[in-house]
A protein has these predicted regions:
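Extracytoplasmic electron-transfer domains, predominantly the class I c-type cytochrome c fold
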Residues: 1-57, 113-179
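Short beta->alpha connector loops of Rossmann-like oxidoreductase domains
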Residues: 9, 107-108
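Short, solvent-exposed loop/turn and secondary-structure capping segments
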Residues: 14, 37-40, 63-68, 102, ...
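Electrostatic cytochrome c docking/interface patches
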Residues: 62-93, 185-189
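Sequence/structural segment immediately N-terminal to covalent heme-attachment motifs in c-type
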Residues: 79-104, 111-118, 174
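A residue-level signal for beta-strand positions that form part of recognition/binding surfaces
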Residues: 97, 123, 194
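Structural preference for beta-rich elements and adjacent junctions enriched in aromatics
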Residues: 190-230
Length: 230
């Protein structure tokens, strides 16, 4: 609902609900992995997308192109075994992140979550890279840790009032750790996600465990977490 101006993935500051124009442009251009939102860069020109960004902002009467408050990245910390180990400790310390994402980052903690509308939500399984809404790059993960996700239970860990607040350096360490969890997942190969029909003579087996199916080429059925519930 563009009239609510509820933009979850943005690069503006923690207390700034309005996104940068580039944030909206990126979502239209690249889409959102793990959702029904496709990328339009193969269909719309760059100017078309810019025009669409300006049009979408009208619904919520957004005038700023680049709000004053922006994310403070400080000095980016490159991923390393030491940084990942430090992020691992911070992730689990006081159940800072594991309270929702689970001890192994699989989103399997028992805490029941609801978004601001009261709908049931599920924490991200951080070991499945194809479900990340933006990307698995540490810089994008740092943004989520810093700003939180508007309208959801994902908080900002840059909030000075939070008992679980992280410094800029600590946020980079957690981002590197989370990126390492994503890298441990097995990506789905795009060429294996299309079901290719093969013409056969005679009848097909009626039972799913029939040995005749062993001769069929395997296909990956690409499932995405599009769950809505209360």
């Amino acid at each position: 609902d563009f009239t609510e101006a509820l933009y979850k993935f943005k690069t503006t500051g923690t207390d700034e609900p309005v996104p940068n124009d580039d944030d909206i442009l990126r979502m239209i251009r690249d889409g959102m992995p793990g959702t029904a939102m496709p990328g339009w860069k193969d269909i719309l020109s760059e100017q078309d997308i810019i025009d669409l960004v300006l049009y979408l902002k009208i619904f919520a009467e957004i005038e700023e192109e680049k709000p004053e408050e922006q994310i403070d990245y400080g000095t980016e910390i490159a991923s390393s075994p030491e940084s990942i180990a430090a992020g691992d400790k911070l992730f689990h310390e006081g159940e800072r992140c594991s309270e929702c994402h689970g001890r192994d980052g699989r989103g399997d903690a028992v805490k029941r979550l609801k978004d601001d509308s009261g709908a049931r939500t599920w924490p991200r399984n951080l070991t499945k890279p194809w479900t990340y809404r933006v990307s698995t790059q540490p810089r994008d993960i740092y943004r989520r840790i810093t700003t939180g996700i508007t309208g959801t239970q994902m908080p900002s860990f840059a909030d000075p009032k939070s008992k679980k607040k992280l410094s800029i350096e600590e946020r980079w360490q957690v981002a590197n750790y989370v990126a390492s969890l994503a890298a441990s997942g097995q990506p789905v190969r795009a060429e294996n996600t299309v079901i290719k029909a093969v013409r056969v003579d005679g009848d097909l087996p009626a039972q799913p465990d029939d040995r005749a199916w062993d001769a069929a080429a395997p296909t990956t059925v690409f499932m995405v977490p599009q769950i809505v519930g209360k």
